[in-house]
């Protein structure tokens, strides 16, 4: 699953990095919600092999509402439980070539919600990008990694995570992302 909003120049890179995974292609389905987009985001996503739903809602603009909409459409068209799990990405994300395989290894070990290492590709672009980079480094090194070593639960944030379909059996109820 991917949320997009005016990011047509970014999604093509994410779509390409998903399509280049070392994981079997027939086990990957890319869903995108083009959220309140008036540009070519939806057509770009479709050209990169995504099943794209378009959502227009000026009252409910958060990523959580976009994911809720997307999972409702998946439920209607495919059945949410017809997929073992769902990855959540933002359109400007890039994946290492073995990302899905490594996340699947953790999933196959019985984990139901898995977060991943996130890094910043534009650290020196501006102070906002640098601040986010420091936040991600701190979060991963001091929170997620330590909790993983101790086999404790952690939290998920924003992007780069996987959850079992049973988590959304009754829909996505988390709109404050």
Mark where each language-model region is.
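Donor nucleotide-sugar binding loop of glycosyltransferases
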Residues: 6-10, 37
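Acidic helix N-cap motif at the loop->helix transition within catalytic regions
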Residues: 12, 39-46, 98
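Long helical/loop segments within the catalytic core of UDP-sugar-dependent glycosyltransferases
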Residues: 54-80, 98-177
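Acidic donor-binding/catalytic loop of UDP-sugar-dependent glycosyltransferases
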Residues: 40, 89-106
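Short, acidic, metal-binding catalytic loop of nucleotide-sugar glycosyltransferases
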Residues: 16-27
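A conserved acidic beta->alpha catalytic loop
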Residues: 34-42, 57-59, 94
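Short beta-strand-to-loop acidic/aromatic patch adjacent to the donor-nucleotide binding site
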Residues: 78-94
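A conserved hydrophobic helix/loop-capping motif in glycosyltransferases and polysaccharide synthases
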Residues: 1-7, 21, 106
